[in-house]
Swiss-Prot record:
Short name of any one Pfam family annotated for the protein: UPF0128
UniProt protein name: UPF0128 protein MJ1463
Family of the protein in this entry: Belongs to the UPF0128 family.
Organism of provenance: Methanocaldococcus jannaschii (strain ATCC 43067 / DSM 2661 / JAL-1 / JCM 10045 / NBRC 100440)
Length: 233
């Protein structure tokens, strides 16, 4: 029986899945909001007391301003979350575009939306600020889950798991640890050996929950995982 190149590629590409629904919501601390570039404000919108966000260090107590047809007044720039509230963020999809939505949730379960911005824009700014270059290079698209994808060298017949060198196995183990923490993931990985210069030849696609990468600790673990396969520029 003749096996064509497409079948060889499909049969030998390794797939590792942590099944379940991609995490849509995650709890964050106020410091995370600041890491994303925002201050949490207690103030007034059109005369009604509420909470909202402004760009980091952009406003101070007593400031008044207009935005999108609404009147804002800053009463206090908060340095901690309001008493008996928690900060949650989730991803919403609208016409194929992902938005990160942040809400304050009180002890009665009432939500107050304080931020809604395009997830890809904020995530990229967050990654750049923290110099997570491997993720920036690998990220391809953002929804409720995001895709990281990279290729180095030309293809061929992928090696079986038993044939993989230590560097490839370390990459898989590290990715699986990240997925265990995020609760969802799908890694497809084809490893073809090494280039004539001794660098790894591979192709991979890795799905993870978008909201998880707004957690700096998880983002750093993803960055380190991608760095295992790093090749010289």
């Amino acid at each position: 029986m003749v096996v064509d190149a497409k079948e060889v590629e499909m049969i030998n590409t390794l797939v590792f899945e942590t099944l379940g629904n991609p995490e849509k919501e995650r709890e964050f601390k106020l410091k995370s909001l600041k890491r994303w570039g925002f201050d949490l404000i207690f103030g007034k919108v059109d005369g009604k007391e509420t909470y909202f966000t402004v760009e980091l260090d952009e406003r101070k107590a007593g400031d008044k301003f207009s935005k999108d047809g609404k009147e804002y007044e800053v009463i206090e720039v908060l340095q901690e979350l309001p008493k008996n509230t928690e900060l949650y963020a989730h991803i919403e999809m609208e016409m194929g575009k992902a938005y990160i939505v942040c809400q304050l949730r009180d002890e009665d379960g009432k939500n107050t939306e304080v931020l809604r911005v395009p997830a890809a824009t904020l995530l990229l700014a967050f990654l750049k600020k923290n110099k997570l270059a491997n993720i920036i290079k690998a990220i391809k698209n953002v929804g409720i889950s995001l895709e990281l994808s990279m290729q180095n060298g030309v293809g061929g017949k992928p090696l079986s798991y038993e044939e993989l060198p230590n560097v490839a196995r370390r990459f898989i183990r590290s990715a699986r640890k990240v997925e265990k923490e995020t609760g969802f993931g799908r890694l497809s990985f084809a490893y073809y050996g090494e280039t004539k210069d001794g660098e790894p030849r591979y192709r991979f696609s890795w799905l993870l929950p978008t909201i998880a990468l707004f957690d700096l600790d998880i983002a750093k673990k993803v960055e380190q995982t991608l760095g295992i396969l790093k090749v010289s520029e």
